[in-house]
Amino acid sequence: HVANRLAERGDTVFGIDNLNEYYDVSLKISRLDNLKKQAKFIFQKCDIGDYQELKDICQQEMFDCVVHLAAQAGVRYSIVNPHAYINSNIQGFMNVLECCRNLNISHLVYASSSSVYGENGRLPFNENHNVDHPVSLYAATKKANELMAHSYSHLYGIPTTGLRFFTVYGPWGRPDMAPMIFAKAILNDQKIDVFNSGQMSRD
């Protein structure tokens, strides 16, 4: 959606994705096919965990702004495959920061996560709340991203903005997200698992 909107307003958009198999790759391909209808959209397959590959692309293209939404997502999967999170969310994010530093970009916008709030019980959530107690490796990597971005902003003057997304849903959404799981269960006349004994409430 971000790439599509930027291309529509006239920006040249260069997309990077490793097209991993965390969820159905055909959905990712379909998204790309849709984006390729935009004249100003370019795509190259790349793993951000590979610094040399990412650096080569950045030196060739000379971007002026970076919107970093690539990451290994999913709280539960971080228990099953922790190394994927270190490679993508820690090493990959460091590689993005280094490329931004070398390019002297005007702004880095990156995806953090609401999961950083962890055991914080204060409601409603606030950007100034303590987020020092993540309860998953995924959340810990996102907290680390915020600290890394702050450090690079301080050291090298890179303007950075981190966005703590909550459950993202809508067209082209990930099939492992709650709205998609619920919708599929309803369509197939299956039960929907409710956690916390049904005692949850809106923030």
What is each of the regions a protein language model found here?
Residues H1-V168:
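N-terminal Rossmann-like NAD(P)+-binding domain of SDR-like oxidoreductases, especially those catalyzing
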